[in-house]
A protein has these predicted regions:
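Extracellular glycan-modifying ectodomains
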Residues: 1-387
């Protein structure tokens, strides 16, 4: 018995030495493609950092992030948690039928931030309506999959009340048309309208919302059943997979929709990104070989993306979209209607939106955000003034 104990101790010490040695010898990684985030760097060793505790915290984060074979350990940990029937893993919920869900609890909701964001949009709409017809200003909140696909959630999942906040925010919006897409999405909850391993909606979910928005604004749209589906990849694992790192996770498909000529909407436009880069499509096929394949839509998020669509039904209409990443799958459809579209992402744009609208002769405005992003966003104040 004593011999076995000694052997186990030797094996354990050797294992620790191997992991520690490997971690020291291996070059630090700056970015984890699997987790889709930058990893911690060594903390600065200063007296102030030691006394404040920043050095100790930074060292803990650094050692955790740079441990040898980190991705493998996380995968093993996830496997053990799943074997123990744990559905709360890495800040996400493991649901039914291969669906994972973003975990945003009631405690994560900042009521004061919501009030600030609502006020910013209210003020923006009031100002925009001085130059744009109110009927051409619209507001669209996208529900997260946890609301639309609640039947796929694991038992005892705690999520903030999306319906309550969508109702509350929509009722406060004036000087605009409010497009509520919940009923349309809920009626298709058995369809593939949200990715299983990512927090975004699929192109089908986005198109259903686009149809609803067109109905609300008086624009034309082609029935979904009449469109041609074109699959770009069947090997997508998104943001929720990056949190959980489950080796058994499903792969998602990414696709576009087009007309009977097999041409995807948004694939034959002229784009200018951040006033510099030029391209001729809303789709970046190079991203399909990368980890974050959702970047297939526009290549990434940018401060401004200007789109010119020569085949649009209304060449005299110029749409401004204030957006988060959920708009990236939505906007290509709008190229069928608007001769010009500009997307502004306030996370990366520091200009004056009012001046931009005047300079570019904007005729229509859409504010499109996912509800989770809207209630937590800290950049919407940019709508009503300079930085």
């Amino acid at each position: 018995m004593k011999k076995i104990s000694v052997t186990m101790i030797v094996i354990f010490v050797a294992f620790l030495a191997l992991v520690s040695g490997g971690s020291l010898l291996m070059k630090d990684r700056e970015f984890s493609p699997n987790e889709n985030r930058y990893l911690a760097e060594p903390p600065r060793l200063t007296v102030d950092n030691i006394l404040s505790g920043k050095f100790q915290d930074g060292l803990e984060n650094y050692l955790r992030d740079q441990i040898c074979f980190r991705d493998g350990w996380i995968t093993v940990k996830t496997g053990i948690q799943k074997a123990c029937k744990d559905t709360d893993i890495g800040g996400a919920y493991v649901g039914k039928d291969g669906y994972d869900f973003e975990k945003i609890t009631p405690e994560d909701v900042d009521e004061k931030q919501i009030a600030r964001n609502v006020k910013a949009v209210q003020d923006f709409f009031a100002k925009a309506s001085e130059n744009v017809e109110k009927d051409r200003i619209s507001f669209l909140l996208v529900p997260s999959s946890g609301l639309v696909m609640a039947d796929k959630l694991p038992a005892h999942a705690r999520l903030f009340d999306q319906a309550k906040y969508i109702d509350q925010i929509e009722k406060q919006m004036k000087d605009c048309r409010v497009t509520d897409v919940r009923e349309k999405l809920l009626s298709h909850s058995e369809d593939y309208i949200y990715y299983k391993t990512d927090h975004h909606w699929t192109s089908e979910g986005a198109y259903l919302a686009y149809e609803t928005w067109c109905d609300s604004t008086g624009m034309e749209s082609t029935p979904l059943a009449d469109l041609k589906k074109q699959v770009a990849t069947k090997k997508f694992r998104g943001s929720l997979y990056s949190k959980i790192l489950d080796a058994d996770s499903a792969y998602d498909s990414i696709w576009t929709y087009g007309d009977t000529k097999q041409k995807a909407y948004g694939s034959d436009c002229s784009l200018t990104i951040d006033e510099k880069k030029q391209t001729d499509s809303c789709y970046d096929t190079a991203q399909l070989s990368q980890k974050d394949k959702y970047k297939y839509f526009f290549g990434d998020n940018y401060g401004t993306v200007q789109i010119v669509s020569d085949h649009a039904r209304h060449q005299d209409r110029n749409l401004l979209v204030i957006k988060d990443s959920f708009a990236n799958t939505f906007v290509p459809f709008a190229t069928e209607n608007y001769g010009q579209i500009t997307m502004i992402d306030l996370r990366y744009y520091n200009g004056n939106v009012e001046e931009y609208m005047k300079e570019h002769k904007i005729t229509d405005v859409l504010v499109l955000y996912n509800i989770t992003n809207f209630i937590s966003d800290r950049n919407l104040y940019k709508l009503v003034g300079r930085i």
